[in-house]
Swiss-Prot record:
Keywords: Electron transport, Membrane, Mitochondrion, Mitochondrion inner membrane, NAD, Respiratory chain, Translocase, Transmembrane, Transmembrane helix, Transport, Ubiquinone
Gene assigned in the entry: MT-ND4L
InterPro entries in UniProt: NADH_UbQ_OxRdtase_chain4L/K, NUOK/Mnh_C1-like
Function: Core subunit of the mitochondrial membrane respiratory chain NADH dehydrogenase (Complex I) which catalyzes electron transfer from NADH through the respiratory chain, using ubiquinone as an electron acceptor. Part of the enzyme membrane arm which is embedded in the lipid bilayer and involved in proton translocation.
Primary location class: mitochondrion
Protein name: NADH-ubiquinone oxidoreductase chain 4L
Spans through the membrane: 1-21, 29-49, 61-81
Swiss-Prot/TrEMBL GO biological process terms: ATP synthesis coupled electron transport
Family: Belongs to the complex I subunit 4L family.
Lineage summary: Eukaryota, Metazoa, Chordata, Craniata, Vertebrata
EC numbers, comma separated: 7.1.1.2
Localization, UniProt: Mitochondrion inner membrane
Organism from which the protein derives: Ochotona collaris (Collared pika)
Any one Gene Ontology molecular-function term assigned to this protein's record: NADH dehydrogenase (ubiquinone) activity
Bilayer topology annotation: Multi-pass membrane protein
SUBUNIT field: Core subunit of respiratory chain NADH dehydrogenase (Complex I) which is composed of 45 different subunits.
Length: 98
């Protein structure tokens, strides 16, 4: 395992720990999710370059598309919750249930 791969795995682990630690605000959770997706994208790119298969070059692009969709939906949810309730606490999200 190279030092680059180890650093990317540490970045993913730190983002995952941040997701568990800073789960009170929606914005903090979204930033941690983006950090996790970025580290997964970098790891998938390095792995696909090392595999030398042409079909594996599509996986990082597909992962990046899903990350962009996740960010758009998360920001739309953040705007909706902050406009409706005036704050972005996650414990207030259960108020959205019927």
């Amino acid at each position: 395992m190279s030092i680059t791969t180890l650093n990317i795995m540490v970045a993913f682990t730190m983002a995952l720990l941040g997701m568990f630690t800073y789960r009170s605000h929606l914005m903090s959770s979204l930033l941690c999710l983006e950090g996790m997706m970025l580290s997964l994208f970098m790891l998938a790119t390095i792995v696909s370059l090392n595999m030398n298969f042409t079909i594996s070059f599509m996986f990082p692009v597909i992962l990046l598309v899903f990350a962009a969709c996740e960010a758009a939906v998360g920001l739309a949810l953040l705007v909706m919750v902050s406009n409706t309730y005036g704050m972005d606490y996650i414990h207030n999200l259960n108020l959205l249930q019927c």
